[in-house]
From Swiss-Prot:
The gene is miaA. The lineage of its organism: Bacteria, Pseudomonadati, Pseudomonadota, Alphaproteobacteria, Rhodobacterales. PANTHER family: TRNA DIMETHYLALLYLTRANSFERASE (PTHR11088:SF60). InterPro entries: Dimethylallyltransferase (IPR039657), IPT (IPR018022), P-loop_NTPase (IPR027417). It comes from the Bacteria. The record marks T104, R126 as: Interaction with substrate tRNA. It catalyses: adenosine(37) in tRNA + dimethylallyl diphosphate = N(6)-dimethylallyladenosine(37) in tRNA + diphosphate. Its cofactor is Mg(2+). It is an enzyme of class 2 (transferase). Catalyzes the transfer of a dimethylallyl group onto the adenine at position 37 in tRNAs that read codons beginning with uridine, leading to the formation of N6-(dimethylallyl)adenosine (i(6)A). Pfam families: IPPT. This is tRNA dimethylallyltransferase. Substrate binds at T19, A20, S21, G22, K23, S24. ATP binds at G17, P18, T19, A20, S21, G22, K23, S24.
Length: 291
C-alpha cells in the first residue's frame, strides 16, 4: 500500500484517513521498511479497554515495531488534544522518526497548526453544564454560545457544545476567542510528509461491515461486558463505536443482530463525518485514492 511518492526516511510522516481505510497497515509498512516509531493519533485507541473495538494494533503488532500512545489511558480517564500534544512532544524527543497515524482530525490540526491554551474548567462547572443540558436540552445550550464559537464548532456534537459552554461560563471568553490566541505548532505541516487516505465510499462501507464482524468474532462483546458494571455513557471512552450498541444488547435492550447492525451504521456515519472533515481541513495534504 506504500504510496507512489518519495518518503525521506528521516522526515516525520502524518497519515490521516477514515475508519477502516487501512491507515495502521500503511504506518506499519513505512516503519517496517524505513524505521521509526508508530504514534497513535486516534482519540479512542488511547484507552486501555478497547483493543478490539477501537481497532488498536494487536499485541503481536505492537511487539514487532515501536508503538507509542496506544492503550495507556484508563477507561474512566479524561484525555484531551492537549494531553496528546504533550505526549507527542515527549515522543519526538526520543529521536525516532515518527509516523503519526489516526483518524482524529483535531489531533492533527493541533499538531500542525497549534493548540490554544484554554484553561481547564472546574468540576462544579461540569456539573452545572450536565444539569443544564439535561434540563434545557442541546438547542438551549447552543443558543447560549457566542456567535463566533457557534459558527466554528459542530453544533450537533453535545460534547463539543458543552465544552464551549463551560469555557464561556467559566472564563467569560468564547472558545473561538481562546483559539484565536493559538501558539506555534509543535510540528508544522511543511516539515512533514502528510498523507490523507481517500477511499471509495462503497469500498469503505464494505470494509467497515466486514471489520465489525471480525471484531465480534475476536471478542468485542466480551470487551463491552467488562465495562458493563460501571458503564457511564458520558465518559469520553464510551464514544467507542460499537461499545454503546453492545452494552445495550447486554442490558437486554436490543438483540445482538440489532446491536451489530446499529454499530455498523454508526461506523459508516462516522466515516462520512471524517471524510467531510478531511476534505475541508486537509487540502494541503497529499491524497491517496483507494482502492
Amino acid at each position: 500500500m506504500l504510496p507512489p511518492l518519495p518518503i525521506p526516511p528521516d522526515r516525520p510522516v502524518l497519515i490521516a484517513g477514515p475508519t477502516a481505510s487501512g491507515k495502521s497497515a500503511l504506518a506499519a509498512e513505512i516503519v517496517g521498511r524505513d524505521g521509526g516509531v508508530v504514534v497513535n493519533a486516534d482519540a479512542l485507541q488511547v484507552y486501555d479497554c478497547w483493543r478490539i473495538l477501537s481497532a488498536r494494533p494487536s499485541v503481536a503488532e505492537e511487539a514487532a515495531l515501536p508503538h507509542r500512545l496506544y492503550g495507556h489511558v484508563p477507561r474512566r480517564g479524561i484525555y484531551s488534544a492537549g494531553h496528546w500534544l504533550k505526549e507527542v512532544e515527549a515522543v519526538l524527543r526520543e529521536g525516532l522518526r515518527p509516523v503519526i497515524v489516526g483518524g482524529t482530525g483535531l489531533y492533527f490540526s493541533s499538531l500542525t497548526n497549534g493548540l490554544a491554551d484554554i484553561p481547564h474548567t472546574p468540576p462544579e462547572m461540569r456539573h452545572e453544564a450536565d444539569a443544564f443540558l439535561a434540563r434545557a436540552g442541546l438547542s438551549a445550550m447552543v443558543a447560549d454560545l457566542d456567535p463566533a464559537t457557534a459558527g466554528r464548532i459542530d453544533l450537533r456534537n453535545p460534547a463539543r457544545v458543552q465544552r464551549a459552554w463551560e469555557v464561556l461560563r467559566a472564563t467569560g471568553r468564547g472558545l473561538a476567542d481562546w483559539q484565536a490566541a493559538t501558539g506555534a505548532p509543535l510540528l508544522p505541516l511543511a516539515e512533514t510528509v502528510a498523507l490523507v487516505l481517500r477511499p471509495d465510499r462503497d469500498w469503505l462501507a464494505e470494509r467497515i461491515d466486514r471489520r465489525f464482524d471480525l471484531m465480534i468474532e475476536a471478542g468485542a462483546l466480551e470487551e463491552a461486558r467488562v465495562a458493563l458494571a460501571d458503564w457511564d455513557p458520558a465518559l469520553p471512552s464510551s464514544r467507542a463505536i460499537g461499545a454503546p450498541e453492545l452494552v445495550a444488547h447486554l442490558k437486554g435492550e436490543r438483540t445482538l443482530d440489532e446491536a451489530i447492525a446499529a454499530a455498523k451504521l454508526a461506523s459508516r456515519q462516522y466515516a462520512k463525518r471524517q471524510r467531510t472533515w478531511f476534505r475541508n481541513r486537509m487540502r494541503d495534504w497529499r491524497e491517496i485514492r483507494l482502492p
